[in-house]
């Protein structure tokens, strides 16, 4: 399947399911089952309920999608600084 045949839509994660799967409500109100892309799993990008995401849907099956981007929350404060390992 070529990349040109995929639909890119925005949505909000409603529920986190086992095995890195999610239930996402799209902007048009449709609910789809989605999974995290390999690149997101590789870089350990955490997706939580309430996150805005961008997903790709196949034109052949509009009930399943692949999450390929998690939008950063502008109003979230920067995280607590972690203790870095200091070489002595």
UniProtKB/Swiss-Prot annotation:
Cystine pairings recorded for this chain: none
Keyword presence, Nucleotide-binding: no
Subcellular location: Cytoplasm
Any GO molecular function: rRNA binding
Domain S1-like: 1-72
This protein's GO CC annotations: cytosol
Keywords associated with the record: Cytoplasm, Initiation factor, Protein biosynthesis, RNA-binding, rRNA-binding
Main location: cytoplasm
Signal peptide coordinates: none
Family matches, as CDD domains: S1_IF1 (cd04451)
PROSITE patterns assigned: S1_IF1_TYPE (PS50832)
Pfam families given in the database record: eIF-1a
Family statement drawn from the similarity comment of this UniProt entry: Belongs to the IF-1 family.
Functional summary from the UniProt entry: One of the essential components for the initiation of protein synthesis. Stabilizes the binding of IF-2 and IF-3 on the 30S subunit to which N-formylmethionyl-tRNA(fMet) subsequently binds. Helps modulate mRNA selection, yielding the 30S pre-initiation complex (PIC). Upon addition of the 50S ribosomal subunit IF-1, IF-2 and IF-3 are released leaving the mature 70S translation initiation complex.
Subunit structure: Component of the 30S ribosomal translation pre-initiation complex which assembles on the 30S ribosome in the order IF-2 and IF-3, IF-1 and N-formylmethionyl-tRNA(fMet); mRNA recruitment can occur at any time during PIC assembly.
Protein name per the record: Translation initiation factor IF-1 3
Taxonomic source organism: Burkholderia orbicola (strain AU 1054)
Lineage of source species: Bacteria, Pseudomonadati, Pseudomonadota, Betaproteobacteria, Burkholderiales
């Amino acid at each position: 399947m070529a990349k040109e045949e995929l639909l890119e839509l925005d949505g909000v994660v409603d529920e986190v399911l086992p095995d890195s799967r999610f239930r996402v409500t799209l902007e048009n109100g449709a609910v789809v089952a989605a999974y995290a892309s390999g690149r997101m799993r590789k870089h350990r990008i955490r997706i939580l309920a309430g996150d805005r995401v961008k997903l790709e849907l196949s034109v052949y099956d509009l009930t399943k999608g692949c999450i390929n981007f998690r939008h950063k929350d502008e109003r979230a404060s920067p995280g607590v600084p972690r203790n870095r390992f200091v070489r002595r």
